[in-house]
Amino acid sequence: MSFPRAAANHPFRVLAVLLAAAVGVLLPGPRAAAAAGGPSLAEGTSVGIHNTYGDTAQFPFLADALDTGASLIELDTWVDPFTHEWKVSHANPLGNKNNCVDAAGPADLYRGGTNKDLGSCLDDLRIWLGAHPGHAPVMVKLELKAGFDATVGLGPAQLDALVRTHLGGAVFRPADLLGGYPSLDAAARAGNWPSRAALAGKVILEAIPGTFEQSNPFDHLWTDTEYAQYLNGLQAAGAIGQAQIFPSVLGAAAGDPRTRYPDASLRQWFVVFDGDAHAYVDGGVDTSWYDTNHYLLVMTDAQNVTPALSDTAPALADATARVARLAAAHASFVSCDWTGLPAVLGEQLQRGQ
């Protein structure tokens, strides 16, 4: 199904709330406001492509992947301490291997040399969205393969600066969800997400710990924790608006997986969760908890849920049914490698149904 476009913003909403408070009139909360413009970001399910940058046979250019209608792209990035760049590749920490180009306008998205850095990939996304203003919001999943390295000027603040430079106002930031609430958790549970229609053409970024980082016995400060600590610092400094990224809790687990963070003050920043679809669905995890609290849930490897489907080329009917099943299982975003099925990649479903 497709979602209707958002209704125009109402400049008198704040005044109305103040007047209502004065006279004791109960007004609709944020969820009702989102409903007026269609399902909120947390009330829908979209589909995206695992390692979107890497399949250059199917997608010679990143724009080709976006042309499928996908609403999630994944970019693996490495910090390069020698060039001070954010490299994009699956396995080379010192080189770029991807389908991103140096584009200055829409016509450049499908030509020129590839294998560019993260800034160029974000430029490609921004330019493509500018040419497709009605496109559903896109989740950019950043896997920081080896984590941050603030000691060489490649920490959370520098990544935020890069995002601001290359995506500008296209980003839906943590501060945009936060509003007047004391924490992201409180804002999410109150349903303060805008409608998906209102977020058309926007980007939401999540950051997860990388595979190399997780296997590094000398790395004791993973991406999720480091970025959450950074958010704590920004909030204390009254500068939370600088943050561009939502840190994500990685890995399916029963209950509230944020209890893994010993510093309880960090847990408030995690309203995005990311894990294996098979572990969530076949593992008996109560995923309704995420939906009830309006948290975003990214389910990866959709093909591995029982019964397993082809990794890359399932039948259209099977893939469509699988996405519907994961939407019913409360996924916000479904990640897969079904690059040849644009009818599936472009789906926008109601979450939890």
Predicted features along the sequence, with ranges:
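Initiator methionine at the very start of the polypeptide chain
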Residues: 1-2, 34
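Bacterial N-terminal signal peptides that target proteins for export
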Residues: 2-16
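Alpha-helical protein-protein interaction elements
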Residues: 4, 18-19, 159, 222
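Bacterial N-terminal signal peptides
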Residues: 15-26
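C-terminal region of N-terminal signal peptides and the immediate post-cleavage residues
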Residues: 24-36
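Catalytic cores of phosphodiester-bond hydrolases, prominently lipid phosphodiesterases
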Residues: 36-353
